[in-house]
Amino acid sequence: MSGNKVEVDKRRTFAIISHPDAGKTTITEKVLLFGNALQKAGTVKGKKSGQHAKSDWMEMEKDRGISITTSVMQFPYNDALVNLLDTPGHEDFSEDTYRTLTAVDSCLMVIDSAKGVEQRTIKLMEVTRLRDTPIVTFMNKLDRDIRDPLELMDEVEEVLNIACAPITWPISSGKEFKGVYHLLRDEVILYQSGQGHTIQDSRIIKGLNNPELDEAIGAYAAEVREELELVLGASNEFDLEMFLAGELTPVFFGTALGNFGVDHILDGIVEWAPKPQARETEVRDIQPEDEKFSGFVFKIQANMDPKHRDRVAFMRICSGRYEQGMKMHHVRLGKDVNVSDALTFMAGDRNRAEVAYPGDIIGLHNHGTMRIGDTFTQGEKFRFTGIPNFAPEMFRRIRLKDPLKQKQLLKGLVQLSEEGAVQVFRPIDSNDLIVGAVGVLQFEVVVGRLKSEYKVEAIYEGISVATARWVYCDDERKLEEFRRKCSNNLALDGGDNLTYIAPTMVNLNLSMERYPDIQFAKTREN
C-alpha cells in the first residue's frame, strides 16, 4: 500500500453545522478535548475571564462570544487524523459557512433537543444536499428538559428529508438524565453530572437486561426497555450505504456541556464517515490517490495575525501531497509559484506545514493574487467545480465619512468580497456602492474591519433591494438589449460579473417573464 493511500485512508474531514445556540461551539471544544488537542475546554459565554473558546480567535468573536469565521483544527483520534472545520453558528454569518461545506467529506449536525430543527439548520442542510454530503446527527442538551426523542427524529425526517437511525437512545433527560443505551454495542453508558471540563471514564453496563442496570438506575431501567421496544419497531436500522449517499443519518444523544456522548459521535465519524473523496473538475474526477498534487481555495481570511497585515488562503488538498518548498501551478493566472511557508492550524495557532495530504487544509500566504475557487495543480490545467457564490439576502448602501478615501474603501471592499465576508455591487448607472450579505452581523463586521484594517470610516444607509441574481445569456444581442432596457437594475459584482439588482421579488418575477432568454441565477461558480 502506497504511503499516500495510508495517509488518505486515515483522514476524516468534517464540519459542524447547527442553528445558533444549539451548542456547536461547546461541541467543537469537547471534540478537541477528546482528541487530546486541549487540556481544558474554554467556556463559551461571558468571556470576562479571558478564557476564550479555542475556535473563536478573532477579536470580534472574543468580544461577542460567537463564531464568525471558519476555524480549522486538526487532531488525531484513535487511528484516524481528524480535520474539523468549525463554521459560524450565529444567526448572522456569511456565505463563508456555505462554502466551507464544499471542502468537507461529511458533516455533524447539532440539534438543541429542547427546540428541534431550526431555520439555520434547514438552510445549511440545503447546501449539503448540493453534494449529498453524509450527515451525522447529535441531539444535544439532554441534561435539560427536552422534547420527545421519537418526535425529534420524526421532525428531522419530515423537515430535512433524511431518514434517521438511532445509534444511542437517552434514558430520561433534564435533572433525571441517567445516560444512553448504545443500540449497536448493546451497552448502557451511565451519565454523571459535573464532568464539564475534564474527561472521566463513564460506567458501562453490558446488556439492556443486565440486573446491574436495575440496581444502578432503578425504575428507569424498566422504562427504557419498554421504550426501546417501541423505538426498534418504529425507526430505521443503520445502513452504511444510505449514510454515505446522504440519505440516512445516524442519531446520537448526549450533552456537550456535560462531556457526555461526544466520544460516541467521534467513534461513529471515524468508523463510518468517508475518507477524502474524488472531486469533480471540468475535465475529469480527481482521485485522492492520484500522485500529482491538486487543491482548491475555499476561503480567504484577511489579517489573521494583527501583528502582520497578512491574508491567508485556506486550501483543501484533493490529490497528491504537499511538501515544503514544492512548486504549484496557479491555474487561473497560468503561473507557477514556489510554496515554502504553508500553514497548518489549531484555530489561531499556526504551524509551518512540512507535509500534508488529501483531506488536509493548509493555509497559503496571499498577497492579493488568490481568490475563492482558485485551483492549484502540479502543471495540469483543470479547474475544480462546485465552489459557489450564493445570492445575498440583505443589502445596504455604503457611504464614506471622508469622501477623499474612495480608493481605500473600494480596495477594502473588494478584498473583503474576495475573502467571502460580503459581496460588493457597483450599479452601472450610478456611483453608489452596495454591500450584500447573508446575515446582518456581516455588515457590522465589514465596517469594523474597514476601520481597523484599512483606516476607512464608513456608514450604511438603507436601500430598496430585495435580492440579486447573476445574469447570463448565450445570445450576445439579446443580452445587450437587456442591458440597455434594464440598466437601472444592473450592477457589476466584485469580479465584474453582471448582476440584476431587484427592488422587489415581484419586480424580479416580472423581469424573468419578460426576458425568458436571460438566465437569472441564485448561485455563481467561482
UniProtKB/Swiss-Prot annotation:
<feature type="domain" description="tr-type G">
    <location>
        <begin position="9"/>
        <end position="277"/>
    </location>
</feature>
<dbReference type="InterPro" id="IPR032090">
    <property type="entry name" value="RF3_C"/>
</dbReference>
<dbReference type="GO" id="GO:0016149">
    <property type="term" value="F:translation release factor activity, codon specific"/>
</dbReference>
<dbReference type="GO" id="GO:0016150">
    <property type="term" value="F:translation release factor activity, codon nonspecific"/>
</dbReference>
<dbReference type="InterPro" id="IPR041732">
    <property type="entry name" value="RF3_GTP-bd"/>
</dbReference>
<dbReference type="InterPro" id="IPR035647">
    <property type="entry name" value="EFG_III/V"/>
</dbReference>
<comment type="function">
    <text>Increases the formation of ribosomal termination complexes and stimulates activities of RF-1 and RF-2. It binds guanine nucleotides and has strong preference for UGA stop codons. It may interact directly with the ribosome. The stimulation of RF-1 and RF-2 is significantly reduced by GTP and GDP, but not by GMP.</text>
</comment>
<dbReference type="InterPro" id="IPR004548">
    <property type="entry name" value="PrfC"/>
</dbReference>
<keyword id="KW-0648">Protein biosynthesis</keyword>
<dbReference type="InterPro" id="IPR009000">
    <property type="entry name" value="Transl_B-barrel_sf"/>
</dbReference>
<keyword id="KW-0963">Cytoplasm</keyword>
<dbReference type="Pfam" id="PF00009">
    <property type="entry name" value="GTP_EFTU"/>
</dbReference>
<dbReference type="GO" id="GO:0003924">
    <property type="term" value="F:GTPase activity"/>
</dbReference>
<dbReference type="GO" id="GO:0006449">
    <property type="term" value="P:regulation of translational termination"/>
</dbReference>
<dbReference type="GO" id="GO:0005829">
    <property type="term" value="C:cytosol"/>
</dbReference>
<dbReference type="InterPro" id="IPR053905">
    <property type="entry name" value="EF-G-like_DII"/>
</dbReference>
<dbReference type="InterPro" id="IPR031157">
    <property type="entry name" value="G_TR_CS"/>
</dbReference>
<dbReference type="InterPro" id="IPR000795">
    <property type="entry name" value="T_Tr_GTP-bd_dom"/>
</dbReference>
<protein>
    <recommendedName>
        <fullName>Peptide chain release factor 3</fullName>
    </recommendedName>
</protein>
<dbReference type="GO" id="GO:0097216">
    <property type="term" value="F:guanosine tetraphosphate binding"/>
</dbReference>
<keyword id="KW-0342">GTP-binding</keyword>
<feature type="binding site">
    <location>
        <begin position="18"/>
        <end position="25"/>
    </location>
    <ligand>
        <name>GTP</name>
    </ligand>
</feature>
<dbReference type="Pfam" id="PF16658">
    <property type="entry name" value="RF3_C"/>
</dbReference>
<comment type="similarity">
    <text>Belongs to the TRAFAC class translation factor GTPase superfamily. Classic translation factor GTPase family. PrfC subfamily.</text>
</comment>
<dbReference type="InterPro" id="IPR038467">
    <property type="entry name" value="RF3_dom_3_sf"/>
</dbReference>
<feature type="binding site">
    <location>
        <begin position="86"/>
        <end position="90"/>
    </location>
    <ligand>
        <name>GTP</name>
    </ligand>
</feature>
<dbReference type="InterPro" id="IPR005225">
    <property type="entry name" value="Small_GTP-bd"/>
</dbReference>
<dbReference type="GO" id="GO:0005525">
    <property type="term" value="F:GTP binding"/>
</dbReference>
<feature type="binding site">
    <location>
        <begin position="140"/>
        <end position="143"/>
    </location>
    <ligand>
        <name>GTP</name>
    </ligand>
</feature>
<dbReference type="Pfam" id="PF22042">
    <property type="entry name" value="EF-G_D2"/>
</dbReference>
<dbReference type="InterPro" id="IPR027417">
    <property type="entry name" value="P-loop_NTPase"/>
</dbReference>
<keyword id="KW-0547">Nucleotide-binding</keyword>
